[in-house]
């Protein structure tokens, strides 16, 4: 009773503090740096539906673009190693973001259960399925984690294309360059069953959709040297 109310208050707090401060800060950064932002496809999403968003990972400014302009309350799913970063790891944990521990099937299952508890009433999940920023502007291969989670929870996967972040600050760059960013939200991919075949089909369809809105110069898969870590 009382403990359940307290838990709900904490959850509501995590939903607020884990999203809105980041959204406002991200919008402010883009406005202060005079970075134009264009959003395509928001009308494809239903307001109170939870999704698993899978964007490509062009650069550091991906975070500002998604936080500031996706227009959905969401949780990040991130690598367990990020939990060790001083202050950042604790802040992300307090905000209810989800760390993936792949050290055993039991830990993976625990991650899925945590996600299931968080993804209600339109709160969604954002995962970079490449697992690392690109060095070239091209997409690397997609890892299975986000798609396994969507399959387990029977949630629709939404492919998202980020374009322009690589030009602003590439992974090997030191200086910020003003450039327009475009966020393209593709049609949600509803589950077509459950299991390995659904996961494979969704991964392939999502990859094709994300790549379709990239400029020609960035089309074609180029594996990142640190994707397997």
Label each region the model flagged.
Residues 109-229:
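Non-catalytic C-terminal accessory region of glycerolipid acyltransferases
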Residues 1-6:
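Short, small-residue-biased leader/transition segments that mark boundaries at the very start
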Residues 33-40, 108-109, 165-167:
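Short gly/ser/thr-rich secondary-structure transition/capping motifs
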Residues 29, 66, 91, 148-152:
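Hydrophobic/aromatic ligand-binding patch that stacks against planar heteroaromatic rings
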Residues 7-61, 65-68:
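N-terminal signal-anchor transmembrane helix
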């Amino acid at each position: 009773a009382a403990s359940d109310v307290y838990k709900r208050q904490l959850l509501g707090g995590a939903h607020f503090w884990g999203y809105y401060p980041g959204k406002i800060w991200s919008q402010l950064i883009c406005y202060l740096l005079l970075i134009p932002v264009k959003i395509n496809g928001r009308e494809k999403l239903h307001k109170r539906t939870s999704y698993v968003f899978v964007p490509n990972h062009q650069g550091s400014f991906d975070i500002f673009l998604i936080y500031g302009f996706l227009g959905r309350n969401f949780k990040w799913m991130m690598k367990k190693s990020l939990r060790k970063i001083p202050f950042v790891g604790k802040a992300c944990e307090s905000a209810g973001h989800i760390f993936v521990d792949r050290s055993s099937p039991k830990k993976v299952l625990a991650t899925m259960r945590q996600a299931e508890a968080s993804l209600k009433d339109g709160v969604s999940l954002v995962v970079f399925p490449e697992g690392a920023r690109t060095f070239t502007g091209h997409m690397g291969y997609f890892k299975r984690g986000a798609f396994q989670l969507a399959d387990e929870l029977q949630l629709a996967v939404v492919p998202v294309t980020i374009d322009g972040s690589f030009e602003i600050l590439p992974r090997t760059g030191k200086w910020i360059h003003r450039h327009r960013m475009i966020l393209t939200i593709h049609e949600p991919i509803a589950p077509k069953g459950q299991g390995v075949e659904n996961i494979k089909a969704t991964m392939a369809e999502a990859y094709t959709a994300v790549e379709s809105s990239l400029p020609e110069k960035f089309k074609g898969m180029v594996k990142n040297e640190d994707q397997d870590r």
